[in-house]
Amino acid sequence: MEYVVLVDESDNEIGQMEKQAAHIEPHLHRAFSIFLFNSKGELLMQQRALSKYHSPGLWTNTCCSHPRASETTAEAASRRLMEEMGMRCEMHEVYTFIYKAPVGQGLTEHEFDHVFIGQSDDIPCINTEEVASWKYMTIDDLSIDIALYPEHYTEWFKITFEEMTHHAGLLGKI
């Protein structure tokens, strides 16, 4: 059974809860989103595995998950990037924000999200239990595709992508 770290609106830990229960009720919990870019400035996207309990088969950012109670968000980001995409990469936390979004089947993501960016030209070696496919996309192509086919993307990615474009100057930090 997996647990998430419950937090207040200042990201102070206030407890733990089983992950699926935290998405049913929903409770604010700590999360992270990774945006890896290649040297051409294209974003590495992943398609969620069809076996995922919510948002299966949808496209999202490079990696996103929840830290364990015993680890920092940076440690969790590195761990999950390796577990999902088979990659190691230096990353920098660039900002945080809170969002709440329904994800279908009566579930809602309510997250205090730590956003990390990094740069790598490595080829992913995906874990097919987590990831169905991957591709690189330019920011312009993503913006157009999200506008035309929003149903192809996870709810949190659409929110996080919009936040990321507002912080576009941060891309110079990678």
Which functions belong to the PLM regions below?
Residues M1-S33, S39:
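Acidic, metal-coordinating catalytic segment for phosphate/diphosphate chemistry
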Residues V4, E42-L43, W134-K135:
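A residue-level structural signature of the nucleotidyltransferase/glycosyltransferase Rossmann-like core
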Residues E18-Q20, A69, I98, L107-I174:
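Nudix hydrolase/Nudix homology domain
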Residues A21-F32, E42-R79:
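Conserved Nudix-box catalytic region and its N-terminal flanking loop in Nudix hydrolases
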Residues P26, K40, M82-I123:
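Active-site segment of metal-dependent pyrophosphate-handling enzymes
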